[in-house]
């Protein structure tokens, strides 16, 4: 995980130093243990190793992941509490919104959010998948819609895929886009200024 973060940090240093500056120092063992106690699970080793490098990013900073704040461990706890407090036992996804391997409900206490969008969507490490899913898979959970989707089979693949995309030039920094944006969004933002 350190090597993956070195790749990301190097790209940020050259292309988006504002984002690099917003990344927090790594979490310590006590912070990680406290979060594991809160969530009632042991985090996957890659997830812990990643958070030992960077414990999220400063709030109100340019986004690392497009349109998503990279959450600190403490913020992950707070987001999870918010979702749990708004729990709807009758909520169910239907039709195209059902994905095999992802629990069909509002919120699972063993979903560990690590990103958050201003509209409430978040990406989570799923430590309680439904039948056909993989423990540690990365999912998207939408606040305003009954949408749950699979993003990556695990956190390492998620982060490595992001590093690969950065190095291929698939993202740009945009002050108007509040941080890193993909090339399609970047072109739309640039058209607004022309």
Q: Where are the model-predicted features located?
A:
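Structured loops at beta-to-helix junctions and adjacent beta-edge loops in soluble globular domains
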Residues: 53, 115-117, 128, 141-143, ...
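Short, amphipathic alpha-helical segments
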Residues: 101, 105-108, 132, 149-152
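A recognition module on extended beta-rich or small alphabeta surfaces enriched in W/G with H and D/E
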Residues: 140-166
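Helix N-cap / beta->alpha transition motif
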Residues: 72-75, 126, 154
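A surface-exposed partner-binding patch
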Residues: 1-118, 173, 188-194
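Short loop/turn segments at secondary-structure transitions that flank enzyme active sites
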Residues: 57, 120, 131, 144, ...
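Long, compositionally biased interface segments
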Residues: 159-194
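Low-complexity, glycine/alanine/valine/leucine- and proline-rich hydrophobic stretches
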Residues: 123-143
């Amino acid at each position: 995980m350190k090597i993956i973060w070195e790749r990301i940090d190097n790209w940020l240093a050259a292309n988006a130093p504002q984002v690099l500056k917003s990344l927090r120092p790594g979490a310590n063992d006590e912070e990680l243990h406290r979060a594991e106690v809160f969530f009632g699970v042991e985090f996957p080793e890659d997830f812990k190793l990643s958070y030992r490098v960077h414990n999220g990013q400063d709030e109100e900073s340019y986004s690392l992941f497009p349109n998503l704040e990279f959450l600190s461990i403490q913020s992950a706890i707070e987001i999870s509490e918010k979702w749990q407090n708004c729990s709807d036992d009758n909520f169910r996804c239907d039709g195209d919104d059902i994905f095999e391997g992802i629990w069909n409900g509002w919120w699972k206490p063993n979903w560990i959010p690590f990103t958050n969008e201003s509209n409430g969507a978040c990406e989570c490490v799923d430590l309680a998948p439904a039948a056909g899913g993989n423990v540690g898979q990365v999912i998207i959970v939408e606040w305003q819609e009954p949408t749950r989707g699979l993003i990556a089979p695990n956190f390492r693949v998620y982060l490595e895929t992001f590093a690969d995309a950065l190095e291929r030039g698939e993202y740009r920094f945009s002050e108007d886009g509040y941080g890193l944006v993909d090339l399609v969004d970047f072109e739309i933002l640039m058209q607004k200024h022309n």
